[in-house]
Every structure is written in structure tokens, then in C-alpha cells.
Amino acid sequence: MRILVSNDDGIYSPGLWALVKRLKEVGEVIVVAPDREQSATGTQVTLRQPLRVQKTHPLIPGIEAYAVEGSPCDCVILGLAKLITEPVDLVVSGINHGLNLGDDVLISGTVGAALQGYLRNIPSIAVSIPVTMEEPENLDSAACITAEVSRRIQNGDITKNSFLNINIPDLPLSQIEELRVTPLAHKTHIETVEEGHDGRKRYFWLRRRQLSSADNKKTDIWAIENGYITISALHERLFQQPVFTLKDAETAGILAAARSCQDKI
């Protein structure tokens, strides 16, 4: 099994190398990751400037590793298209230092990187662990869970067209009671804008704040808050597509009314 590993915290992030350490027990690992922090870049792709790549010294011997001056999505696209010459069987993004729950997935560079594998028909995993003021203490817990999920994809126990978002409490696995398959919670954060002045110009900070704790016991946020590991199956739209229908008469009426409006100009 050949595994491309990327992230959005940068190529020297401890979470990435904790993941590599366990995934190398599953298959051949190639790292293609940003050369610097790229959090909250979502699905950003670089189109108006060249991408520069440096083969770099790995923190674990025997691993082929590339640092890219680009986004997490750039890394996976470039890795699959040019840097890795043999077919890739799995894309894994993480371990992100910070959970990716609910609508976080819409702006997550970690999830965005995994999405690029899934869009190319490669099973893909995004994995995250909470972080506060300190570095996570149990990165190996997240790495072991991800390695086991990877084995089950390899063996066919988990469908090979999977796009999975895994979040793991910062605890030893012996203290985690259960792993749950959960849907994403909706409307989990609110953005606010703070204004300041540096003596010359105004500036603004965007702040993202979590809303009150989830009370729906089926969602990923509730499960994590109660000490469970969560696995959420995603697809290219990230959230389930809402049901939206219009009768033929309604669609015709909209078009007719719009034409009438345009005729008045």
C-alpha cells in the first residue's frame, strides 16, 4: 500500500511525523506537505504563481519527503501528478493540531488536502486532535487509530471510495470508551470582526468562536465533548446536499417572470 501523507500545519509538525511513524507499518509512505503553516486554507489552490518544491530531510529515516511552497491542496495535487511516480492507494492528511468538527470542515486545510485525493478516486482520511495552550500529548493515539482504519481500507473492510474525517480526544486509547460514526454538526461557529489601529492604519482581526456545546447526541461535536472518537463520512460537497425541488410550472414561471422583467429595460 502506497500512502501520500500531507497536512496544513507544515512539514515539520509533530503530528505529521507521529502519523508517519505508524503509517509506515501499514505501507510505503511519501510525505508531500507545505513548507510552513497553512491552517484554514480550505480548498485553496495556487493558480497564478509557480509552485516550488524542495526534497527535504525526513524526521523519520527512510521516508521520502517534499516541502512545497503552497497550500495543502497544492501538495496533494502535485504529489499525485508529479512527485510520486507509482499509483497511490491512500491519502492521509494530519494529524492536525486542532479539531475539525461540524462546519470547520468547510475551511480546514487538513480536510481540503484529503478532498483532493478523494476527487481523484483515492480513499482519503483527514485526522485531527484537540490542542489548547500546549502541544497534544497523545498524538500516538490518533496515529494508531488512523493506521488501523488504513489497514481496514486496504483489506476491504472499509469501502475503498471513502472520504473520512476522524477526530480523536487527546487521551491515551485506554481511556477512550468508544469510537462512533457520526454526522457533522451544523452551525457550530460564529465569526466576529475585531478592529484596531496601529498608529497609522486601521486593521481587522477575524475571530472564529465556537457556539454553545452541541446537545444532539448523534453529531461529531457531542461525541468528542463526551470523550469519544468520531469518524464522519464526507463527500465532495462536505455536507449532505439539501433536498430542493421545484415543479415544472414553478420553473417555467420563474423564467417567464425574469424574461418579462428584462423586456422592461
Swiss-Prot record:
Its EC number is 3.1.3.5. The keyword Phosphoprotein does not apply. A divalent metal cation binds at D8, D9, S39, N96. It is an enzyme of class 3 (hydrolase). Binds 1 divalent metal cation per subunit. It catalyses: a ribonucleoside 5'-phosphate + H2O = a ribonucleoside + phosphate. It comes from the Bacteria. GO terms for molecular function: 5'-nucleotidase activity; metal ion binding; nucleotide binding. PANTHER family: 5'-NUCLEOTIDASE SURE (PTHR30457), PHOSPHATASE, PUTATIVE (AFU_ORTHOLOGUE AFUA_4G01070)-RELATED (PTHR30457:SF0). Nucleotidase that shows phosphatase activity on nucleoside 5'-monophosphates. Belongs to the SurE nucleotidase family. This is 5'-nucleotidase SurE. It comes from Dehalococcoides mccartyi (strain ATCC BAA-2100 / JCM 16839 / KCTC 5957 / BAV1).
